[in-house]
Amino acid sequence: MADLEAVLADVSYLMAMEKSKATPAARASKKILLPEPSIRSVMQKYLEDRGEVTFEKIFSQKLGYLLFREFCLNHMEEAKPLVEFYDEIKKYEKLDSEEERTVKSREIFDLYIMKELLSCSHLFSKSATEHVQSRLLKKQVPTDLFQPYIEEICQRFRDDVFQKFIESEKFTRFCQWKNVELNIHLTMNDFSVHRIIGRGGFGEVYGCRKADTGKMYAMKCLDKKRIKMKQGETLALNERIMLSLVSTGDCPFIVCMSYAFHTPDKLSFILDLMNGGDLHYHLSQHGVFSESDMRFYAAEIILGLEHMHSRFVVYRDLKPANILLDEFGHVRISDLGLACDFSKKKPHASVGTHGYMAPEVLQKGVAYDSSADWFSLGCMLFKLLRGHSPFRQHKTKDKHEIDRMTLTMAVELPDSFSPELRSLLEGLLQRDVNRSLGCLGRGAQEVKEDPFFKAVDWQMVLLQKYPPPLIPPRGEVNAADAFDIGSFDEEDTKGIKLLDSDQELYRNFPLTISERWQQEVAETVFDTVNSETDRLEARKKAKNKQLGHEDDYALGKDCIMHGYMSKMGNPFLTQWQRRYFYLFPNRLEWRAEGEAPQSLLTMEEIQSVEETQIKDRKCILLKIRGGKQFILQCDSDPELVQWKKELRDVYREAQQLLQRVPKMKNKPRSPVVELSKMPLTQRGSANGL
């Protein structure tokens, strides 16, 4: 029966994998719903306050670029050629071979440069043209050949197009997507969890599918009770920090994190899914690797280490078991549980796996940095070639003996190794860190320039264009079955109680890596969600027009911000009422949908603007004169933050203004009229945006 369950789990998992690769959007069991277009008023202010509404910030984001591109192609005729030119250059930069780049560069030059020069309509500088021409004449086609044009195209976008984009509906759509991104609160319900694929000291790893996009991931679940029992809180939190440091930027050689979240019982990391097993497993199945095969793995691992070290992260646990293969045979470094940030302080701790730890790591009280990883790389490459660590000969398992040999033994390299390989390993396994390869001041660049890698095109490595020496079997789960992986004994943690103080440790644990979420959305549901939202918004706009509803009430007024909130403020009312609010320098107005604003609250009536909590939801509390109160609830975190800030700012400025207004004897004053005579012109107006 257990065998049948294992087979069914494998079949379900493999089917989910195949469907996810073919049509991930079709596998989505939840829908992403974009907020109303009116969210723009709040989100624009929220993003502006954080310096996010600039050309560089928006253009560098995947969804920002896609929407900017769509605006140029469909709504701005004069920008269309610039976008097409930019796209062609980006295609050129991704080409593998010099032959392909030669053909493509000539095509781009003829179509976008020479053609414009002949028609005297070339909009770019003479220096950019000469830069490209001179290299083409010398038959030089580096990947950055057109970089001067990229810079000038972006400058044109910045000067001529960006402001028009900000005023367009495409920027509104960008605000809608950013609101979704900044309000992600993941739970287990956001994933379909499949079979177990691994187990560690604190928990298990499962294959899973994200419900709203259909994308497959690995879910690493750590048990909070087990963490507490083993006093592993610092390790668990450190792994989350290290993953957040290395999971940005383009690096296909690290198992990166897209999300982190927690439940009352578990910490969960959502990671890249690797289906090809690990190098330790393949070494045992395949036998030792040849020099050329090892060079392939070494090159990809070196780029992974370079990415980590550029972020001041030392890995400290490099070994074949931590190198995972994807379904095509390319590798990624996994499990950053022992990684360490050395940007502010160098570590001293002796951590890692015996037989791979550098001498400076083993020596007590000695500080080290990325040097530790280059020594470990030498140990690992030796194992791929010989089947054992250079300091674990005769299958000794005595950790003290292995450490002693690491600190004292001169490594003997077989005569069968090529001179280039011997030189590489001697450099990496040098016990004196000041003479070790990779530790002489230039880091990974020293290793990449070693003669052993002379024939390697590192751009080809980065683009994963070299054929892997070993391709994992397709249609198989390259992991032990659930029975062999085993499970934790629940009795171990039966007496462990999680207190509020334990949960407080994980208060800041949840995280979404923006660029990875945007890439996931772009690859799966972006077009579908946009099309459905366009259709719904067009239908609603037509209906409002037919009913004669006013949708530009704030336009031309000194409205600071507007948008939907839910309110609860009537002593006889215990239900939330959704209303549309307008914040002015002297008052807060609101209305039900389709109605003219009919209710208002002046700043003179308000005593304080505070934050409160209603049933685990943060809300805004307005205390009103006469002991009354007014509670506002927002649909998303950014809205709550921005409404609270703007209400406090307006309230404070209104109070300062009221204090400056001389008290008029024997004459009652209307707070609305009196304040509206002196608008706070220094505050920005949303102008109906």
Curated annotation (Swiss-Prot):
The active site is at residue 317. GO terms for molecular function: ATP binding; beta-adrenergic receptor kinase activity; Edg-2 lysophosphatidic acid receptor binding; G protein-coupled receptor kinase activity. It holds the Pfam family PH. Belongs to the protein kinase superfamily. AGC Ser/Thr protein kinase family. GPRK subfamily. GO terms for biological process: desensitization of G protein-coupled receptor signaling pathway; G protein-coupled receptor signaling pathway; negative regulation of relaxation of smooth muscle; regulation of the force of heart contraction. The PH domain binds anionic phospholipids and helps recruiting ADRBK1 from the cytoplasm to plasma membrane close to activated receptors. It mediates binding to G protein beta and gamma subunits, competing with G-alpha subunits and other G-betagamma effectors. InterPro entries: AGC-kinase_C, GPCR_kinase, Kinase-like_dom_sf, PH-like_dom_sf, PH_domain, Prot_kinase_dom, Protein_kinase_ATP_BS, RGS. SMART domains: PH, RGS, S_TK_X, S_TKc. GO terms for cellular component: cell projection; cytoplasm; plasma membrane; postsynapse; presynapse. The modification Phosphoserine is found at residue 670. This is Beta-adrenergic receptor kinase 1. It comes from Didelphis virginiana. Residues 558-652 form the PH domain. ATP binds at residues 197-205, 220. It is found in: Cytoplasm; Cell membrane; Postsynapse; Presynapse.
